[in-house]
């Protein structure tokens, strides 16, 4: 078990915010996680459970303990199920699936972060969400040290939400996630510009490797590398609005993109609305909006969490003024 004091979290958040925590603890097994929670009973520190930090905005120093998983492994349990340690890199899991003819995860290629976070955030892209794959989540209860095995339905997944993100927040240390894949390849090509990108390559029926590479190329073209430009990927969730609201806006904006959710709701891309407000490529101090994708906020160098908060709240205000729609961060802010 690794323990550090007055520890910089700069390397533990992709936004590149240099915030410190009072104490940093990394556990590398279920047994160490249980030992850790027993020691926490004797203390009264505020807690932050931290994964890869790819979906986190640190708004200041944290006077508490950061708990970080170092449990990193992958194993195939049976023909369709794969179990990963909570610290196993998400895209390495996707790569494993593709190379072992296990299908379903390929549309989630090169999403940053770790497998444990997939069970918290219900990450998603191109018509697929983690909830479509998650079979079981193993977690240690902080209050008791007991190991629990939660099935998919227990976690109450919805768009970028789960019980781990809400009522179970800071109550469990996720130690592993088991995913159920498919041995039958049924590619999903109709979300975003996947089919158009394949057509440019002269590919009509892509192999899973070709689909993964195409999605990787699409994402790399519009999303900045956090090793070069601090960011947390898509900053805002795409709002889901009533059909009547969509029709009202569609009458004003003929080319407004949208995705039908059901008979009564439509999803409108937040990035499109932000771009319509003139924010694409613009900055507010050392924080800005990426010039290739308006949904991504970036650290232009030396930005604090407060700088990013000021930017995203200004964008929220402008979108609400122009479209009458509230957009909410997908990224978690802490301390909040």
Predicted regions and their residues:
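Anion-binding (especially nucleotide phosphate/pyrophosphate-binding) glycine-rich loop
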Residues: 1-143
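Phosphate/pyrophosphate- and phosphate-bearing ligand-binding catalytic cores of soluble enzymes
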Residues: 4-5, 11-17, 147-306, 322-336
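Residue-level signal for inorganic ion chemistry
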Residues: 29, 53, 113, 145, ...
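Short glycine-/small-residue-rich flexible loop motifs, especially phosphate/cofactor-binding loops
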Residues: 37, 94, 195, 271, ...
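A common structural junction motif
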Residues: 42-46, 316-323
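Beta-rich strand-turn-strand
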Residues: 102, 305-308
């Amino acid at each position: 078990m690794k323990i550090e004091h007055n520890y910089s979290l700069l390397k533990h958040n992709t936004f590149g915010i240099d915030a410190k925590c009072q104490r940093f603890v990394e556990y590398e097994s279920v047994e160490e996680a249980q030992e850790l929670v027993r020691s926490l009973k004797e203390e009264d520190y505020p807690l932050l459970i931290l994964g890869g930090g790819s979906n986190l905005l640190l708004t200041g120093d944290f006077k508490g303990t950061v708990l970080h998983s170092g449990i990193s492994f992958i194993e195939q349990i049976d023909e369709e199920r794969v179990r990963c340690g909570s610290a196993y890199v998400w895209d390495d899991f996707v790569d494993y699936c593709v190379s072992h003819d296990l299908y379903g995860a390929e549309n989630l290629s090169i999403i940053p972060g770790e497998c444990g976070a997939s069970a918290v955030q219900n990450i998603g892209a191109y018509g697929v969400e983690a909830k479509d794959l998650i079979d079981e989540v193993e977690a240690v209860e902080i209050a008791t040290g007991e190991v629990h095995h939660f099935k998919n339905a227990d976690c109450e997944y919805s768009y970028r939400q789960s019980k781990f993100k809400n009522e179970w927040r800071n109550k469990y240390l996720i130690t592993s996630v088991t995913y159920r894949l498919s041995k039958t390849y049924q590619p999903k090509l109709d979300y975003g510009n996947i089919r158009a990108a394949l057509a440019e390559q002269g590919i009509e029926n892509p192999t899973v490797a070709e689909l993964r590479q195409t999605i990787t190329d699409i994402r790399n073209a519009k999303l900045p590398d956090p090793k070069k430009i601090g960011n947390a990927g898509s900053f805002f969730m795409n709002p889901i609005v009533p059909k009547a609201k969509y029709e009202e806006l569609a009458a004003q904006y003929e080319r407004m993109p949208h995705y039908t959710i059901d008979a009564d709701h439509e999803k409108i891309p937040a990035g499109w609305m932000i771009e319509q407000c003139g924010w694409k490529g613009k900055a507010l101090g050392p924080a800005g909006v990426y010039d290739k994708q308006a949904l991504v906020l970036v650290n232009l160098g030396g930005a604090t969490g407060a700088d990013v908060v000021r930017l995203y709240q200004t964008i929220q205000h402008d979108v609400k003024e122009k479209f009458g729609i509230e957009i909410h961060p997908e990224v978690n802010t802490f301390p909040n």
